[in-house]
Amino acid sequence: MVYPGRMADTSHALSSSVLRERLEAAFPSLLEELTQLVAIPSVSSDPAHAADVERSAEHIRERFAALGLDAKVLRETAADGTEGKPALVAHSPRIEGAPTVLLYAHHDVQPVGELSRWSMDPYKAEVRGDRIYGRGSSDDGAGITVHL
């Protein structure tokens, strides 16, 4: 795998079979990371989950920092003094000759609504066939996991 701060040998393209093998090898760790994100009820629209939103941002910051990125949790303060929700910014040093890439994702989730309408715990990722279910698993936990 290629990690931030290291350039892969780009002198030749990866064959689709090599790429598939690498993705399959990485899948268990990616699934574990996604499972950890789904377990955090980071509902930003609900003040009762403010600590969970903070925990989500910090969890992701720690993961990026562990990969060698400079990662920070930032907040804006509104004119009325209200502190904003946490946003995470991470970057790696520029590699000469490599393009600049910007990746974006959000770490908060929508409320679950009526729990009686769920057939499972919304904050416990569940694999069914070739799909992963859980609040925020695709929007946007999968995006964050792929960034990691």
Give the predicted meaning of each segment.
Residues 9-137, 144:
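Acidic/His- and Gly-rich active-site-bordering loop/insert found
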Residues 1-2, 41:
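Intrinsic structural disorder
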Residues 2-3, 9:
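Short, positively charged and aromatic/hydrophobic N-terminal segments
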